[in-house]
Amino acid sequence: LDLIEEYGTDSLRLFLSSNISPHSDIKLSPNSLDPYKNFMNKIWNAAKFINLNFESEGNSKEDSFFDAWICNEFNILLDNYSQHIENCEVEKASYELYHFFWDDFCDWYIEIAKISYLNNKDDELLNTKFRMKQVFCMYLNLLYPFAPFISLELHDVLNKDSKFFNKSRELYGFNSAKQDH
């Protein structure tokens, strides 16, 4: 219970799901939970950035190169995640979630959006506002089984009038993933 109080339930759940593998024991120590606590902070900070800087949703007009790129990367994540869940490879599914969010969404997409935001490129920002929130909400949908508390909290913050948990990727206009990047 002390670990849950210090690191959070979602951090512990994600740690456990990431370290499940057949025929092996999980070595649980406070230091092993640090990356997952940091990951929950990263998710929270991304939501805060989206909520503060992208208050209104834009129109889904023509995607910029980077908007199309993040949609494609999300579709790759979704395909891999679905396959891993089908095959009961929970640790691989959580690995995919972790690396998509940290590497693709935060380290690339949000950083590129910040440049457009700071340069006041309104034409690019209109669609980026829409896509960023859309991809983030769909990501939270996938994260929900692993980290339900932060997923639900951020759902309430970002989608007061929306029911994103009931929407499929077809409703969002996502097509099949293109693996040729």
Question: Where are the regions that the model predicts?
Answer:
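Helix-rich, typically C-terminal accessory recognition domains appended to large enzymatic cores
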Residues: 3-181
